[in-house]
């Protein structure tokens, strides 16, 4: 689907009821079927006669017997690649492989392996109708979490990141039934199109209603009114359906630290949306009823590609987090999904953000230029521009990080007492940054994202773009701006007192 997409751009850089729905909002409290030791999500789906046809995770095996690679990273320093596998069959990712391989540099996730025998791997997405420029892979070090007591890495999607497979095997097409889930974060969201995982067009274009069937998670409201907060919706192409014909305020969403997002669609008459806290409890059914009555959704016309982090036409302005997800053949039962949720909870996903220190004054040095982030002419007025300059040891080049939420910070210039701001809340590539009075909005909130080797990317919350050294310039006075993530050192900053 396409909406609020980044404008197609080129840059030289060192690189989504006439029939009454049987819909309810209920909390499912049953525990589902009993699980044997070592029984993981795809084993559970298989026992329910709805086997996985795609299974993706950078954190753990999704079959009890799986002992292969989970994902592949590419090293920035020399372009070499390596696979990250599991510690043992049916186990968790061996993050030490990544840490060792990427030591002294940064890495990009370039492939997420399908754990089924169908080889529906995800690779970096090509351009499409909404944005003809190919996407970028995710920063491999950006999302460290704990699962099963082990350090592992999720997939951190910023604006411009996306993965795809247009030539899949066994994924539902036409009106065939399917189910799917993903585990994501309830605090890393925006209102741009489209943080999706699931079934999409095979040509990277919006080809019409019913051609997609993907889980969406975020705050974009396609059919007003919407409940506030991030919600699971069905991206069925040309609409993010919270339930029914689109607007479904009973789908109140979920903003827990980790979220289980569930969607199933029988292809002809019915779909269902569920969510759960991936750390505890059961699934809530947000909608279970008739497919939309608008033209094209009865029956569905799914095409069978798989996308992650983007819309079907490569709309790539969204942000989100991905830890694991599967797609099934057939329409899973509630009991099966309950058992899968219980297994996800057993993983014990957790996350701890300890850097930077709240209120400490830091200097931000661009890795490519060696220059520090600077308020032009030590300005203190609203609108003061931001550039890069040799370190002068003054407070015009010092910044305090003040925590305002889950890895969300305002960045205050020590001399001016004003915060780092995306000018006019811009969404376009190249949006300038300046100093402004604190307004409490997401245009002034930043995520501090590790990139390995003591380097960080700074992601503004409203657009998902990163703080960028304009054209990778090295001269004093070179401006800072916002751009999609490009996997280069011009967008990395060392942060030190």
Predicted regions and their residues:
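Acidic glycine-/aspartate-rich tracts in secreted/extracellular proteins
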Residues: 78, 116-118, 187-189, 266-268, ...
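Short, hydrophobic/proline-enriched secondary-structure or compact coil segments at domain edges
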Residues: 65-79, 153-155, 181-182, 306-309, ...
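Residues that flank catalytic or metal-binding motifs in active/ligand-binding sites
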Residues: 67, 108, 151, 176-178, ...
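Extracellular glycan-recognition/adhesion modules and their associated mucin-like linkers
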Residues: 354-380, 395-428, 442-474, 489-497
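Compact disulfide-stabilized, cysteine-rich extracellular microdomains and processed peptide cores
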Residues: 309-312, 339, 390, 417, ...
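Secretory targeting and sorting signals
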Residues: 2-36
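GGW-centered surface loops in extracellular recognition modules
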Residues: 37-132, 181, 346-352, 359-362
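Extracellular glycan-associated modules
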Residues: 30, 39-52, 107, 127-137, ...
């Amino acid at each position: 689907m396409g909406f609020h997409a980044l404008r197609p751009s080129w840059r030289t850089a060192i690189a989504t009821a006439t029939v009454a729905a049987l819909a309810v909002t209920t909390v499912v409290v049953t525990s589902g079927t009993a699980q044997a030791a070592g029984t993981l999500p795809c084993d559970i789906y298989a026992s329910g006669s709805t086997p996985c046809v795609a299974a993706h995770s950078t954190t753990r095996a999704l079959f009890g017997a799986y002992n292969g690679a989970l994902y592949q990273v590419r090293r920035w320093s020399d372009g070499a690649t390596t696979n990250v596998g599991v510690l043992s069959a049916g186990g968790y990712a061996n993050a030490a492989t990544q840490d060792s391989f990427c030591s002294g540099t940064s890495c990009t996730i370039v492939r997420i392996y399908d754990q089924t025998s169908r080889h529906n791997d995800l690779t970096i997405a090509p351009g499409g109708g909404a944005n003809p420029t190919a996407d970028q892979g995710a920063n491999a070090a950006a999302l460290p979490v704990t699962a099963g007591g082990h350090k592992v890495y999720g997939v951190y999607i910023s604006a411009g990141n996306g993965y795809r497979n247009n030539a899949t095997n066994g994924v539902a097409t036409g009106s065939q039934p399917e189910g799917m889930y993903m585990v994501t974060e309830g605090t890393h969201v925006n209102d741009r199109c489209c943080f999706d995982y699931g079934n999409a067009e095979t040509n990277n274009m919006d080809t019409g209603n019913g051609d997609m069937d993907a889980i969406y998670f975020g705050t974009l409201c396609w059919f007003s009114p919407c409940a506030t907060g991030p919600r699971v919706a069905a991206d069925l192409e040309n609409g993010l359906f919270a339930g029914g014909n689109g607007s479904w305020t009973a789908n109140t969403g979920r903003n827990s630290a980790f979220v289980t997002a569930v969607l199933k669609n029988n292809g002809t008459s019915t779909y269902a949306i569920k969510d759960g806290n991936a750390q505890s409890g059961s699934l809530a059914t947000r909608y279970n009823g008739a497919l939309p009555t608008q033209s094209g959704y009865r029956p569905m016309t799914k095409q069978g590609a798989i996308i992650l982090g983007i819309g079907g036409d490569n709309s790539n302005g969204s942000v989100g987090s991905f830890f694991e997800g599967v797609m099934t053949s057939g329409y899973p039962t509630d009991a099966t999904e309950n058992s899968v949720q219980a297994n996800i909870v057993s993983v014990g996903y957790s996350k701890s953000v300890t850097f930077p220190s709240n209120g400490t004054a830091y200097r931000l040095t661009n890795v490519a230029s060696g220059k520090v982030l600077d308020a032009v002419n030590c300005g203190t007025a609203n609108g003061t521009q931001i550039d890069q300059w040799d370190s002068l040891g003054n407070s015009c080049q010092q910044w305090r990080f003040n925590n305002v939420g889950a890895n969300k910070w305002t960045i205050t210039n020590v001399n001016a007492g004003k915060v780092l701001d995306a000018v006019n809340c811009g969404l376009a590539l190249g949006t300038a940054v300046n100093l402004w009075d604190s307004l409490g909005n997401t245009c002034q909130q930043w995520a501090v994202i590790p990139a390995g080797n003591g380097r960080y990317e700074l992601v503004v919350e409203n657009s998902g773009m990163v703080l960028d050294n304009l054209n990778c310039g090295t001269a004093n006075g070179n401006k800072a701006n916002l751009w999609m993530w490009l996997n280069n050192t011009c967008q990395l900053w060392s942060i030190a007192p």
